[in-house]
Amino acid sequence: MEKKELLYEGKAKKVYKTDKEDYYIIEYKDDATAFNGLKKGVIEEKGVVNNKVSSILFEFLEKRGIPTHYVKMLKDREMLVKKVTIFPLEVIIRNYAAGSICKRLGLQEGIKFKEPVLEFCYKNDELGDPMINEYHIRALELATRDEIDLIKERAFKVNEILSEYFLSKDIILVDFKLEFGKNQEGILLADEISPDTCRFWDKNTMEKLDKDRFRKDLGQVEEAYLEILRRVQQV
């Protein structure tokens, strides 16, 4: 598969066309941003870690019946994916109170919800990715009712699978963000699953092992990312 021209560059990834119309190459960057781009920096080897972690998790989910855009890992920083049209939605699943929901609802960090909380955000940098509900999604024609139902069903299933998986690695999956796209195959899980898009806490120490270390200037950011990679690579 030959890499062609750059199609899109985001905060954490570059997307390239290939010599096959239905496939793209994603290259993961070391650039880090937080608070909708207000804080910027570099996390050494982040791109390598996120590419490898995402590849392992996509393969794991595929084996358990979750269709994804992932095809294979090409290089340390690159993966081959199926071309999809991305829904302009962030699908957030929260198992514990952390981050913005604590400020928004006056919750103490670390409270475990009786059941997972699902939130939608409208992917729009100019608006700051505002939270929306299913009525907004249909009104803005971002997805149909059937598509929303399928996305929710898949998101909860991913949460069920990954929560159990990470617990086996002594990691609590606190919350995470998913994105979905569609092509001729149907709706596929897309984007990435990594310490950039998930909150991971060590089960025994409650130490943060994710991008919150960058957001909150906690230090040892690279070490936390590498620790997640080390654990997911364990058989």
UniProtKB/Swiss-Prot annotation:
Which InterPro entries does the entry link to?
SAICAR_synt/ADE2_N, SAICAR_synt_PurC, SAICAR_synth, SAICAR_synthetase, SAICAR_synthetase_CS
Q: What is this protein called?
A: Phosphoribosylaminoimidazole-succinocarboxamide synthase
Q: Which Pfam families match?
A: SAICAR_synt
- The domain of life is Bacteria
One GO biological process term: 'de novo' IMP biosynthetic process
What would be the name of the gene that encodes this protein? Answer: purC
NCBIfam families, per the entry: purC
- Which HAMAP family does the record associate with it? SAICAR_synth
EC code(s) of this entry = 6.3.2.6
The EC class name is ligase
UniProt entry keywords in alphabetical sequence: ATP-binding, Ligase, Nucleotide-binding, Purine biosynthesis
Q: Name one GO molecular function term.
A: phosphoribosylaminoimidazolesuccinocarboxamide synthase activity
Q: Which reaction does it catalyse?
A: 5-amino-1-(5-phospho-D-ribosyl)imidazole-4-carboxylate + L-aspartate + ATP = (2S)-2-[5-amino-1-(5-phospho-beta-D-ribosyl)imidazole-4-carboxamido]succinate + ADP + phosphate + 2 H(+)
- Give the protein family: Belongs to the SAICAR synthetase family.
Q: In which pathway does it act?
A: Purine metabolism; IMP biosynthesis via de novo pathway; 5-amino-1-(5-phospho-D-ribosyl)imidazole-4-carboxamide from 5-amino-1-(5-phospho-D-ribosyl)imidazole-4-carboxylate: step 1/2
Q: What is the lineage of its organism?
A: Bacteria, Bacillati, Bacillota, Clostridia, Thermoanaerobacterales
